[in-house]
Amino acid sequence: MPMFRSFVPRKIQPWIYLFIAVTFQLSGGVYLGALNQMIGGMALMREDILMCMYANLAGMAIYFPLLFRMKFRFTNKTLLTSAALGVLVCNLIAPHITFLPLLWLICFIEGMCKIQGTFECMSNIQLWMTPKRDFTVFFPWLHIVVLGSIQLSDLITTYLMYHYHWTYMNLFIAGLMIIVLLIQTICVKHFRFMRKFPLFGIDW
């Protein structure tokens, strides 16, 4: 993986990116494992919180067609750093926002950052998972990461909510994003696998 600096052992490089992919998949603007506590703590209706989840999913779906154009324009380090910063900021401010349109917008942006980070990690370790680009191998691994992270996210949310407070899940994810940013700063360098591709005409 040429984006890593020389001192990072080759054997652990893919595992680092797999870890980063899991951290992005654990994230969300709000966490439905603490749904009832959020309804009481933020004085919102159940439908309001569910709309946050829909906004998060919409952010991932709408941004998905742009992922390859972004990959061809920016370096892996730039994309992962910006995605981690976006998730970090969204998780820090989401618990303190009760104005619903703004909260939905924050969750929408968080979804865009989430899919950006996950895509960058998984696309770079695809050949490590299956050197022949066999999608019958790659997609089961991808589903394990995505679906496993969804279940793990609810478990962590429930644990933190029971012992501390429902907002601690947001702080936990913010802490993971700080770790991701440190990895990107220390272990990763800017690397282009092809010439810079302009964003002109991205809507086509």
PLM regions and their residue ranges:
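Paired small-residue
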Residues: 90, 101-110
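Helix-loop-helix hairpin linking two adjacent transmembrane segments in secondary transporters
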Residues: 138-192
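Juxtamembrane intracellular "pre-TM" segments in multi-pass secondary transporters
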Residues: 2-7, 189-204
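Cytoplasmic helix-loop-helix junction between adjacent transmembrane helices
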Residues: 108-144
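Small-residue-rich segments within alpha-helical transmembrane domains of MFS-like 12-TM solute carriers
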Residues: 25, 29, 95, 111-119, ...
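Extracytoplasmic
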Residues: 12-49, 54, 64-67, 118
